[in-house]
Amino acid sequence: MNPFPRAEISSSALQTNLAALRQQAPASRVMAVVKANGYGHGLLNVANCLVSADGFGLARLDEALELRAGGVTARLLLLEGFFRATDLPLLVGHDIDTVVHHSSQLEMLEQTVLSKPVTVWLKVDSGMHRLGFTPEQFSTVYDRLMACPNVAKPIHLMTHFACADEPDNTYTSVQMAAFNSLTAGLPGFRTLANSAGALYWPQSQGDWIRPGIALYGVSPVTGDCGANHGLVPAMELVSQLIAVRDHKANQPVGYGCFWTAKQDTRLGVVAIGYGDGYPRNAPEGTPVWVNGRRVPIVGRVSMDMLTVDLGQDAQDKVGDSALLWGKALPVEEVAEHIGTIAYELVTKLTPRVAVCLA
């Protein structure tokens, strides 16, 4: 087998995670968020595995067009909306919904001639202060959208949480109250809950939930693990040992000689590095799974390789598999060692890593 790293994507895990989220929010439809190349899992791979999802959320128009070209017929929603008036005929032609979060988008809708109206999800800034119309702007914007012939009726309504991944932070309740007060009595769907909302804030689930990271088997909450919610890691990042060598006490290893062995040991060199998207700043002690056990990274991660301490009596050999993250070694745990979040790890793999659907 070729020794280079690959991301093995489990279709059964994706389907298990969708089912688990439906169980968490039985009254809600599921807008499966597949932006950023399906969180690094492969856009079409994920969409084809999740054909039973009620819709798909994307960040960019080209992602939506790729899904349509790939035969996906489900509802598609551009979570950041459109950015040019010339995008609007594409939304119409390919039956793509759009978020409207800024006055520039509203003006383009009012000024463009379209063959039929576009389905709009009006985004309310309930407290994240990134995208969306403020409560003070909402009524005027809503009325303008209602008056616009290019906007399908009813208008759907949405917001996004700033702190839902902090289960003890009451700011999510503040945001829910603001959104619900502002939109009370209006027709159309409502969507508030991201992965953390769906898992930790059931009162936010509404008509649609928008899970992203949880679909891939990962918890959105630091210190938590997807398995605690019946989720299964959909990605296994695997490579191989390309060298096993005896290493003497007091000898350094790797660039800068930052790690020195305290005793005689055996080192393994794994064929993956920052050129593949594995973080260069992974510190000494970050775990890798080799032959049924965790072994620590030692020395600096280089472009194509990293080194692990297999232990003095190790029997590992060249060609043995090395798991960087997956079911046996949760990506949440690896992210915590590195000082980042699992989202960043799974989405930053480079094109050198083959993504294979299993």
UniProtKB/Swiss-Prot annotation:
In this chain, substrate is annotated as bound at: R130, M303
What cofactors are annotated for this protein?
Answer: pyridoxal 5'-phosphate
Alphabetically ordered keywords of this record: Isomerase, Pyridoxal phosphate
Q: Which residues carry this modification: N6-(pyridoxal phosphate)lysine?
A: K35
The pathway this protein participates in, as annotated, is: Amino-acid biosynthesis; D-alanine biosynthesis; D-alanine from L-alanine: step 1/1
EC no. given is 5.1.1.1
Enzyme class, broadest EC rank:
isomerase
Which reaction is catalysed here? L-alanine = D-alanine
Gene3D superfamilies recorded for this chain? Answer: Alanine racemase, Lyase, Ornithine Decarboxylase, Chain A, domain 1
| MF term (GO), any | pyridoxal phosphate binding
- According to the lineage, what is the superkingdom? Bacteria
GO BP, one annotated term: D-alanine biosynthetic process
**InterPro entries in UniProt:** Ala_racemase (IPR000821), Ala_racemase/Decarboxylase_C (IPR009006), Ala_racemase_C (IPR011079), Ala_racemase_N (IPR001608), Ala_racemase_pyridoxalP-BS (IPR020622), PLP-binding_barrel (IPR029066)
Pfam families from the UniProt entry: Ala_racemase_C, Ala_racemase_N
UniProt lists the family membership as follows: Belongs to the alanine racemase family.
What function is annotated for this protein? Catalyzes the interconversion of L-alanine and D-alanine. May also act on other amino acids.
| Name of protein | Alanine racemase
Q: Which organism is it from?
A: Shewanella baltica (strain OS155 / ATCC BAA-1091)
Please name the taxonomic classification of the source: Bacteria, Pseudomonadati, Pseudomonadota, Gammaproteobacteria, Alteromonadales
Gene label:
alr
